[in-house]
Amino acid sequence: MLLDTHRRIVCRALAVALISSCVVLLTACRTDRRIVLTASVAASLTDAIQAAEAAYTQAHPEVEFRNNFGGSGALAQQIEHGAPADIFLSAAAGPMNQLDDKGLLVPGSRRDLLRNSLVLIAPLQSTLSGFDQLAGPAVRTIAIGDPGPVPAGLYAQQSLTAIGLYNTLHPKFVFAESVRQVLAFVETGNADAGLVYATDAASSGKVRVVATAPALTHDPIVYPAAALRTGAHPAAASDFVAWLASPAARSLFTQRGFTMAAQ
């Protein structure tokens, strides 16, 4: 009787140990299959890309995303100097061309993904009614992105130059590190006006669109995307970039005010 009891206890202990070992092995296998994609993303894509990533991971649960948001020019510089990244989504062709010229893109992965427009915004209570009023005394500060690293700032510079206001308004400029910072300056009243993308303005309930910059006054606002050769998972990154042009992703972008670039 005692021997049988002892045997049963030993068998149960062995069974528990075996099950525990299997659980550990299965967990380890799942962990080994996990793919972490690091994406360097233009700040104006913050909301849209997070929605796209959430949709993608539903169909690809093994994939996890880590995002680095900022001005496209600054992100390109970081990547060029060795910052870890699998994917780059830029708000202008220039920063992407910079990496392409260095041979840092996965061949065939680059695509023009989205389009946007540039708008003049002001706080809700502002009486500003057009670009022509920016030079008046009621407007003391105007937020724009730094034209060097921030594509929205370059587009703003081009547009204001084309309509003959850039040099006149220069003393009023507050330069921001990203288009989202421009939006924040206007939202908080730290700037009387600002130039941002239409999608950024639409995401805020604290500003209003005063006017849209004429499209011919600045370069076309196109968002290219590409997988990076220096990333840890170039194949998975290329798959995600291709998926961003799919009908499922397209609806997520258009819901947020973007238009799709012609493929």
Model regions and ranges:
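Exported/periplasmic ABC-transporter solute-binding proteins
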Residues: C29-H60, E64-F69, G73, Q77-H81, ...
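Periplasmic-binding protein-like
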Residues: D86-S90
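Twin-arginine (Tat) signal peptide motif
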Residues: L2-A15, S21-A28
